Every structure is written in C-alpha cells, then in structure tokens.
C-alpha cells in the first residue's frame, strides 16, 4: 500500500517513518512532486489536518494522511493551540515560539499543558480522524537538543526528561503523535 504523509516538515516525516510497518510504502510530499505550501486555514487542529489530507487526495489522487498538532497550556486558556507553529509570528520560528511562551508563563504557577495531535486519513475518498494526547507541563527553561518545536520545554507526566532529551523511540512510545499514529496503523490493519 502506498500512502502519502502530507507534511513538508522533515522532522515529522522522520518521526513517523520510523513507526511505519514494512507493508506500507510511505511517501513524502516531495516524492509526489507536491512543492506547494498547503495553507492551514482551519480554526481547529482537526480542520487543519483535514484540509491538508483533502488537498493531497483532490490534487494528486493519492491516499494520504496529514496531521496537525497543537500545544495547549491550561493557564493560557489552551493557547497557543491551533497557532502553535506560528505563535510568535508567521515565520514558524521554534526559538521565538518558545521564548514567547516562556515569557507568558513567567509569573504563572500553573504550567500544566498537553500536546494534541490529530491525524486525518483520506483513504479512497473516505476520511477518518485519529487523536493522540500527551499530558505534561512546561519547564522553566529549555533542556535537551533532540526533537523540534516545543520539545525542549515539554515534560511529559511521569518522566524526568523533556521530549528533547529523549531518544526518538522512547518519545514515540508516549508522544501525542505516536499515540495518534498507532491508532491510524491499527485502523489500516483491519
């Protein structure tokens, strides 16, 4: 089975590719010559994932899945949420996003947060959603050099290491994206 993962983010692609069973040939957007930036115009994480999956299916004809992820901080009423990637501006700068979030949390005691990933699968024109959530808290400063996005400041519940301190295999077992992806794989194996 050929399946396109609708992302231009090489870190996301690498993270998911490591989890794909051998009977699925995972293709990237560049593999199908999709070089355009698919605009995320949805008001929710679910909508953004669906927009990307629908775009690839409708324009390229491939079965496809797409994800969108948001970091939801309790004391910020769920922000940055759907705007996580461009929290500090449209440039999608991880460092600037982290700095802005840490600044906003400086005088707050409640640092609880969760990552939420929604994967939209468009298979033969039918769409299904798979959700993964990882609860944790925002650290006061960055730790670790692995991962991407908010990984250096996210400490998952029950762990002493940030996502950026974990090996990819360890992170994938507990991460929001790993949880959603395992749901997707379970669905595809039926």
UniProtKB/Swiss-Prot annotation:
One GO cellular component this record assigns the protein to is: cytosol
Q: Which family does it belong to?
A: Belongs to the HAM1 NTPase family.
Active site at 68
> Which top EC class applies here?
hydrolase
Tell me the cofactor note.
Binds 1 Mg(2+) ion per subunit.
Residues recorded as binding substrate, renumbered to this chain, are 7-12, 69, 148-151, 171, 176-177
Which organism was this protein described from? Christiangramia forsetii (strain DSM 17595 / CGMCC 1.15422 / KT0803) (Gramella forsetii)
Keywords attached to this Swiss-Prot or TrEMBL record, sorted alphabetically, are:
Hydrolase, Magnesium, Metal-binding, Nucleotide metabolism, Nucleotide-binding
Catalysed reaction, written as an equation: XTP + H2O = XMP + diphosphate + H(+); dITP + H2O = dIMP + diphosphate + H(+); ITP + H2O = IMP + diphosphate + H(+)
Tell me which HAMAP family the record gives.
Non_canon_purine_NTPase (MF_01405)
Q: Which GO terms describe its molecular function?
A: dITP diphosphatase activity; ITP diphosphatase activity; metal ion binding; nucleotide binding; ribonucleoside triphosphate phosphatase activity; XTP diphosphatase activity
Tell me which cofactor or cofactors this protein depends on: Mg(2+)
Q: Could you identify this protein by its name?
A: dITP/XTP pyrophosphatase
- Report the PANTHER family cross-referenced here: INOSINE TRIPHOSPHATE PYROPHOSPHATASE (PTHR11067:SF9), INOSINE TRIPHOSPHATE PYROPHOSPHATASE/HAM1 PROTEIN (PTHR11067)
